[in-house]
UniProtKB/Swiss-Prot annotation:
The keyword Iron-sulfur applies. SUPFAM superfamilies: Radical SAM enzymes (SSF102114). Pathway: Cofactor biosynthesis; biotin biosynthesis; biotin from 7,8-diaminononanoate: step 2/2. [2Fe-2S] cluster binds at C96, C127, C187, R259. This is Biotin synthase. Transmembrane segments: none annotated. It comes from Coxiella burnetii (strain RSA 493 / Nine Mile phase I). GO terms for biological process: biotin biosynthetic process. Catalyzes the conversion of dethiobiotin (DTB) to biotin by the insertion of a sulfur atom into dethiobiotin via a radical-based mechanism.
Length: 321
């Protein structure tokens, strides 16, 4: 389906396909471009937590809401390296660092640049998510050796206005442009289950599809309703709708890595297995996802074994029991 001129109507038709027919098409596409036994493992660390000035309705790190998140200033290089070493020992391929900023403060960015250089020296791929970037900041990250920059669109432009008011959709597009122009791989996806419609989910995929280049990796998050945020009582997305969205993401983006991201802690092994068959071929690996719970490494390893996928070897020192 590469090169297809997708629009709302044509993507909507995919959603109307019988479930197994849609998954069959997605799995065929996946097999054509990837080793179906391979699962890309990434670890995500919160290097600066809380007091974010943005008002993203889903986020417990926003300074606008009273949540249980403990505020923490930018952690030091030694702490980052210790986490990265543990991640590598346990089979992670990429180490991602997230900071709750609107954009990286001038006084803090040099510290992050040093983190990138040091983590890469361990033999890991690097990814950061630091908020909005101007062109100069993106070039500095590239010079430090950054491999990926994560900046999600979150949802459709229409629904976005109900979720965030402190940063525009165009602000996000501008950051993605600066990242691309700097020669950094783009990691960009969204969040499902915030109360959006199917049309919103379709439009999110079309916004990603219409970027000058497809994102190298596409994280698909399921909302984790956090107490104290405006979305704490939001009804969960239907599991079949979630799986279908992943399958359609695979059809629109045959060569992108699709990461099953936030929300896995609440997913059954069976639901995750369906997501993998639909085309998801990456997970965040480790018992924490920024400030949210994530399945323990043993649970993930056991699931990968059950499914006959490639399994990392846990060291006895770092295994999670």
């Amino acid at each position: 389906m590469k090169g297809r001129n997708w629009n709302q109507a044509s993507v909507a038709k995919l959603f109307e396909l019988p479930f197994f027919e849609l998954l069959y098409k997605a799995y065929e596409t996946h097999r054509s471009h990837f080793d179906v036994r391979d699962m890309e493992l990434c670890t995500l660390s919160s290097i600066k937590t809380g007091t974010c000035p943005e008002d993203c309705a889903y986020c417990p790190q926003s300074g606008h809401y009273k949540t249980d998140v403990e505020r923490e200033k930018l952690i030091n290089l030694e702490a980052v390296l210790e986490q990265a070493k543990v991640a590598k020992e346990n089979g992670a391929r990429r180490f991602c660092m997230g900071a709750a900023w609107r954009s990286p403060p001038k006084r803090e960015l040099p510290k992050v640049l040093e983190m990138i250089k040091s983590v890469k020296a361990l033999g890991l791929e690097t990814c950061v998510t630091l908020g909005m970037l101007d062109q100069e900041q993106a070039l500095q990250l590239k010079e430090a050796g950054l491999d990926f920059y994560n900046h999600n669109l979150d949802t459709s432009p229409e629904f976005y206005k109900k979720i965030i008011t402190t940063r525009t959709y165009q602000d996000r597009m501008e950051t993605l442009k600066n990242v691309r122009n700097a020669g950094i791989n783009v990691c960009c996806g969204g969040i499902l289950g915030m109360g959006e419609s199917r049309a919103d989910r379709i439009q999110l995929l079309l916004e990603l599809y219409q970027l000058p280049e497809p994102p190298t990796s596409i994280p698909i998050n399921q909302l984790i309703p956090i107490k104290g945020t405006p979305l704490e009582n939001t009804k969960a997305i239907d599991p079949f709708e979630f799986i279908k969205t992943i399958a359609i993401t695979r059809l629109l983006f045959p060569t992108s890595v699709i990461r099953l991201s936030a929300g896995r802690e609440a997913m059954s092994d069976e639901l995750q297995a369906w997501c993998f068959m639909a085309g998801a071929n990456s997970i965040f690996y480790g018992d924490k996802l920024l400030t949210a719970k994530n399945p323990g490494q043993n649970r993930d390893v056991n699931l990968l074994k059950k499914l006959g996928l490639k399994v990392p070897v846990l060291t006895e020192e770092y295994a999670c029991y």
